[in-house]
Amino acid sequence: MAVVDLYNMKGEKVGTQELKDDIFNIEPNFDVMWRYVDYQLSLRRAGTVSTKTRSEVSGGGRKPWIQKHTGRARHGSIRSPIWRHGGVAHGPKPRDWSKKLPKKMKKLALKSALSQRFKEGNIIVVDDIGFDSSKTKNMRQLIKAFGFEGKKILFVLPWKRSEYENVKLSCKNIPGLKAIIADNPGATRENESIMRIDGLNVFDILNHEKLVLTRDMVMKIEEVLG
């Protein structure tokens, strides 16, 4: 079992937390992580760019001049791609850029990203995090207690509840900070049969230097990925 220190919200060590080796301490597969990030970014592409061909541009139905005896080049329409204000030849059209990735590769990529952060010593486990109000000052005090000023930090929280929502909102005005509530509608601490970790993704883990997990979130990750 891998072991990390367990902290409270004041940045004080209060114990240790065991992490499953098959999730947090595997040999990172960088190829699979790259494939996951490529897959994830492909889902963000709107694919709505569109250009008009010569047949779609308004006008140009009349031949600009007769075919012969003018001394000029032959043209059939002023909307030809070689004309100003003409249509576009071989231009982009709306398309679906999304890619597919097998479930096993998604799991392996998540495990690899978590293991990479563990090997770097950048996983911080907190017994619990919660704010009574969504104020930037609360978050600044928290990151100061841990000595993380100027770091890119990803907070991953397990359940939808007001204290966690306040943590998420408190991150918004501080560059480099992001909070994810890795939950799905209907999931609760008591109802583990439908537990998922929606929102937890490889791109965000790799895009932030520090990964802060609550104790419940560690248990949830091990339940889903185990």
Swiss-Prot record:
Matches recorded under InterPro entries: Ribosomal_uL4 (IPR002136), Ribosomal_uL4-like (IPR013005), Ribosomal_uL4_dom_sf (IPR023574)
* GO CC aspect terms: ribonucleoprotein complex; ribosome
Q: Where is this region: Disordered?
A: 52-71
Q: Which SUPFAM superfamilies match?
A: Ribosomal protein L4
Tell me, what is one Gene Ontology molecular-function annotation carried by this entry?
A: rRNA binding
What GO biological process term is on the record, naming one?
translation
Q: Name one Pfam family in it.
A: Ribosomal_L4
Keyword Lipid biosynthesis found: no
Q: Does the keyword Thylakoid apply?
A: no
Query: Which UniProt keywords are present, listed alphabetically?
Result: Ribonucleoprotein, Ribosomal protein, RNA-binding, rRNA-binding
Transmembrane spans: none
Q: How does it assemble?
A: Part of the 50S ribosomal subunit.
Family (UniProt): Belongs to the universal ribosomal protein uL4 family.
Task: Name the job this protein performs.
Answer: One of the primary rRNA binding proteins, this protein initially binds near the 5'-end of the 23S rRNA. It is important during the early stages of 50S assembly. It makes multiple contacts with different domains of the 23S rRNA in the assembled 50S subunit and ribosome. Forms part of the polypeptide exit tunnel.
NCBIfam families named among the record's database cross-references: rplD_bact (TIGR03953)
HAMAP family membership: Ribosomal_uL4_B (MF_01328_B)
The molecule here is called Large ribosomal subunit protein uL4
